[in-house]
C-alpha cells in the first residue's frame, strides 16, 4: 500500500524514514529560505518541526516566499507555515513560536531536544 512517503522510502530506505519520523528540527525564520526548508522537511517525513518567527507576511513577500500569497498577507508567517506543513504531513507535530531568536529569548529553546 502506498502512503505519502513511499517514494521517499524507496530512495532512503525504511530505517532512514523511521529516523526522520522520530526526529525533531527547529527552523529559525520561515520567510525566504526558511519557508522552503520547512516544506522540504515536512515532505521528507520529519516527525516534529519547531518554527520560530515573529514576522507577518507582507505584499512584497509574494514574489519570493513560498508561504506568501494574497490570502496570507497580514498573517503571522509561523501560523501560515504551520497550516501548510499540517496539510502536507498531518502526522508532523508543528510548534509555532511567535518570537524572534534574540539573546533575551534564547532561554525559550532547549537545543538538546533537536536532532
Question: What residue spans do the PLM features occupy?
Answer:
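Glycine-rich phosphate-binding loop and adjoining beta1-alpha1-beta2 segment
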Residues: 46, 51-89
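N-terminal charged helix/coil linker that caps or initiates catalytic domains
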Residues: 1-26
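Conserved N-terminal Rossmann-fold NAD(P)-binding element of oxidoreductases
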Residues: 27-29, 52
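Aromatic pocket-lining residues of Rossmann-like dinucleotide-binding sites
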Residues: 41
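Hydrophobic/small residue at the entry helix of a nucleotide-binding pocket
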Residues: 33-34
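A structured beta-alpha segment of the ubiquitous adenosine-cofactor-binding alpha/beta core
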Residues: 74-114
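Glycine-rich, flexible N-terminal cofactor/catalytic loop recognition
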Residues: 27, 44-47
